[in-house]
Amino acid sequence: MLIIFLFFNFCYGFNEPLNVVSHLNHDWFLFGDSRSDCNHINNLKIKNYGYLDIHPSLCNNGKISSSAGDSIFKSYHFTRFYNYTGEGDQIIFYEGVNFNPHHRFKCFFNGSNDVWIFNKVRFYRALYSNMALFRYLTFVDILYNFSFSIKANICNSNILSLNNPIFISTNYSKDVYFTLSGCSLYLVPLCLFKSNFSQYYYNMDTGFAYGYSNFVSSDLDCTYISLKPGSYKIFSTGFVLSIPTKALCFNKSKQFVPVQVVDSRWNNLRASDTSLSDACQLPYCYFRNSSGNYVGKYDINHGDNGFTSILSGLLYNVSCISYYGSFLYDNFTSIWPRFSFGNCPTSAYIKLNCFYDPLPIILQGILLFLALLFIVFLLFLVYHG
């Protein structure tokens, strides 16, 4: 029987990498949207778990922070807000689709959604790289030494309103300070309009801004800075101060563990982007994707078989997670587990040219088994004299 096992192991391989997101133990957490929002099922006209891309048995395990219609990027920048909060050693992200080219957001009528897609890439790159080093994620408000009675109403559309950052005139009489305390690290936006000249008229009653800028960038260009706790002063050489109001809070440092990201996209009938794959880079991130179009069972954008298969890895532990996929065992594999963590295969097996008939192997196994029985019988006779 051992020969039969070795035959199939070496010639066919029992430990190929699986295209799933999974975990080594029960210390994991998932951040998602409607495709993993079990609470949203109760809001449907017909309570149908086919709406989800995760298995319903995961709904009450306390390891998922998801909200239909939301994303971490959207909650970070806009008034539409969900407080994504969770903790785990192995972090999985399956969200992001709720801000993409389909929404066509831009700050101005003649602005550019492309600038915002670049912002999205930079945001998720910073999020993923930081979460490889921390267990805990949540949102926090940034508090100031005074309230802003006058602020510019910039970057609004019929679907979203920007509230992080907000903008005030640099002629404001008070110095602007903020303090960060309570978290190990903060992700804070620094957004500006790249311009050589700007002039605005502020409505003192409504705070609405009318104006002109000689833009180099046609929209709001953001970078995302990881700041340690401390007191900060904001100053600018421009005409407008960009004031951050929210930050991502990272807490409870851990040994480096790459995050796992599942592509978040629509059916091909809607425009999607490649922001998540662009942001998810080695060594801090593993990217998982389905090879086909997203075609849901509940509707075309919910319940796709390919992505359900990828998320099915959350139902069980694996031995090893790597760039190529997850491994169930730590023995042999045909694909070396590059950039891996966990108990991973120690060597790649040599794939032999196994073209011979397996029947002789089976007969050898039977003969080996009979030989073992005969030896046991002889030992029995010797023992009983």
Swiss-Prot record:
One term of GO molecular function: sialate 4-O-acetylesterase activity
Designated gene of the protein: HE
State the signal peptide span.
1-11
Q: Which organism does this record belong to?
A: Human coronavirus HKU1 (isolate N2) (HCoV-HKU1)
Specify the protein name: Hemagglutinin-esterase
Annotated S-S bridges = C38-C59, C107-C155, C183-C249, C191-C222, C280-C285, C320-C344
Give me the glycosylation sites of this protein. N83, N110, N145, N171, N196, N251, N289, N331
Concerning its family, UniProt says:
Belongs to the influenza type C/coronaviruses hemagglutinin-esterase family.
Q: What is the stated purpose of this protein? A: Structural protein that makes short spikes at the surface of the virus. Contains receptor binding and receptor-destroying activities. Mediates de-O-acetylation of N-acetyl-4-O-acetylneuraminic acid, which is probably the receptor determinant recognized by the virus on the surface of erythrocytes and susceptible cells. This receptor-destroying activity is important for virus release as it probably helps preventing self-aggregation and ensures the efficient spread of the progeny virus from cell to cell.
- Keyword annotations of the record: Disulfide bond, Glycoprotein, Hemagglutinin, Host cell membrane, Host membrane, Hydrolase, Membrane, Signal, Transmembrane, Transmembrane helix, Viral envelope protein, Virion
Q: Which spans are transmembrane here? A: 362-382
Q: Where is this region: Receptor binding?
A: 122-239
Topology check: give the Virion surface ranges. Answer: 12-361
The cellular location(s) given in this protein's UniProt record come to: Virion membrane; Host cell membrane
